Amino acid sequence: MAKIAKQLTDLIGNTPLLELNKYSATKHLDTPIIAKVEYFNPGGSVKDRIALAMITDAEQRGILKPGATIIEPTSGNTGVGLALVSAVRGYHLILTMPETMSVERRNLVKAYGARVELTSGKDGMTGAIRRAEELKREIPGSVILQQFENPANPQTHYLTTGKEIWEQTEGKIDIFVAGVGTGGTVSGIGRRLKEYNPNVKVVAVEPASSAVLNGKPSGPHKIQGIGAGFVPKTYDASVIDEVLDIDNDDAIRTGRELAANEGLLTGISSGAAVYAATLLAQRPENRGKRIVTLLPDTGERYLSTVLYAFDEYPL
């Protein structure tokens, strides 16, 4: 039987797992860290999953009409996913994002036909959310899908990503590690894995300089895609066993090591997740345990950032 997708959205999900053998060897780990490589999604990130899920959910509930305008505050990857799905399904899209987001991300969504409105970097995602709400009041029939509150966000990870990880590992997983932006990824996957095996440990990752999940003040950081500066409604603390706070430089250094050692060109948040997984693997009590982490996106949209600014930001 021919395997031909009818539309691009049919290719979202079912991303591969990869053993980080060379990286793990350089860190002298007993067991290689395993990575779910989400840049194999057609839009280049894990956020393709929630973009498709939120739009489909809004269609099914009748709140998103044909040809309507979708508005979304986003730090980048969700915007790319929404732009891709909107192009396929015929929606107008306006994205609000902090001006600190990379130029590649802005231009990428524009290429799909989206309109971008930049907000003050010092206001973080809070400013982007505020501007999105203003636009919704101005544009009749528009819809904000609101990834930070939408239950379809964690639910799609429960239904797809978590199930994929369990099946790909044949149930042999002890610890799952993921960064927290909206919290939907770690919450949905964590809930599914704990249903399969309550002993699976779920670890969330956030920037050390904006460690709100650990009760510390929000602040600026360099790890794009995680650390929104507030605790999202889509974050389910009940499935989280531990939250690790990761420094900017450790995330950046690890991201560079993944490219140099594994040929994995990923984003800064992938570096944070793998560094957190490394810290866990180095604990004596975790010796020999299988640790799976998730690499949210491709590094191609970070080439203008500190991640690959080797001369200007040496480590």
What are these regions (language model features)?
Residues 1-315:
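PLP-dependent amino-acid enzyme catalytic core
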